[in-house]
Amino acid sequence: KVDKVELLRMYNDLKLLSEVYPKLSVIGSGGNINKLFRISEFPKGRPLTTVKLREELDMLSAIPVKERLRKFDLKPDRADVIVPAAELYLQIAHHVKATEIWVPTIGIVDGITYSLCEQYLAEHPNWDK
C-alpha cells in the first residue's frame, strides 16, 4: 500500500512535468501492465488506450479474486494487485493528460541489451570477420 502523501507528491510532480512537456506519453513496464495489455487483446505495437484500460478495470473490479485467477490465468500474487495497479496507471495517465499507455512487449533488461547490441554492431560492422 502506498502512503497517500507520497501519492499526492507523485501526482503533483506529474502535473508539473505535464506543464513543461505537454505531450507526454506513458510507457508501462512490468507484470501488471503486461497482463492488462494481454487481457485487452490490443494488437502488439499499439498503445493501450485509457478508455480500454478503464473498461478492464471496471470488469476486473466486479470479479472476485478467485474468479480472476481462473478466468484470466492470473497467479495468486497478481490477482489481488492487478486492480490497484490499473487504477494507478489510469491516475498517472490522467495527471499527465495522456490517453494512451505504451506497453512494450520486451522487458527493460532485454530492451537495454538489444539496444547495446545494436549500438555495438553499428560501431563494429565487421565484428564477425
Language-model-detected regions and their locations in the chain:
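Helical "lid/coupling" subdomains associated with nucleotide-phosphate turnover
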Residues: 1-129
